[in-house]
Amino acid sequence: MQGSFTFGVWKTKLYYLFRPPSEWDSLLISVTNGCTHRCTFCSMYLTKKFSVRKDIEDIKSDIHKAGKMFGSRVEKIFLEDGNAFVVKSNILIELTKYCHQQHPNLRKVSSYAHAKDILKKSDDDLKRLVDAGFTMVYVGIESGDDQVLKDCNKGATQDDYALAAQKCHQAGIDWSGIFLLGLAGNDPEKSRRHAVESAKLINRMAPAKPRKWYISPLTLEMTPGSEILAQNLEKKFQPCTSTHILEELYALIGNTADDLTDCIFNTNHASNYLSLKGELGKDKKDFLCRVEAGIKDPKVRRPEYMRGL
């Protein structure tokens, strides 16, 4: 299937839908509308009041219509919107099973998730969800620093993320954690604490048994409508320079454990100044060398005009 296609875009009004970059070729199925949280750095869901689609048969109809239209071409389905994992476990299980029934070559069903909603689900619920064919959650962690998390209205702590990751690992749900470089602002002490605590959290999230898991740092962009942009205009928040961002990335990587395994680390997102892809800690030394080169030589960095969300 070439490119994302969306079913169930809330019929009466056209909305922007957002999905992880790696879900570019997925079928997008609307299960919720908007996001359960209003983080200071995010402007993606400002036009949407959060709600859950109540009519399960209506969602199934979207899944069925997509099956008729695309046949066996659909291999990945992403459940929209900002936090589809908030939906009750039995409903998610029912929808996941139906996705597989209608799309015979389906190999991946995923969604965005908030740590608190993962923690609300029992271990048995998560295991039944995996048995139904649900495969991955994308979790916007942003930081391991509890103060930064509080300041940006994230609604979770480092402990929450560490426990949520372990619950997913144990259930067999793939974990993709997203961090946000620059979120602490340009204060050197706060920036370093943001990086070091984020590395500490990565170490705590490592699965007890071998399995692939994913970490993807992005770089803060102060987008129109976001609270953090308003804070910047009021001189309450000052963003990091590109050099500071790379120093933060260096500290984050440098403070991760050397013995991390199967952790796919990716900074290919267009917001970042450097593109790295490999494994922590197998490729840790190489990552540090490349980030150090970017710190020393601005020519190595992605130009500002090529960056974006």
Where in this protein do the model-derived segments appear?
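Short, solvent-exposed loop/turn segments at secondary-structure boundaries
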Residues: 51-54, 88-90, 150-154, 187-191, ...
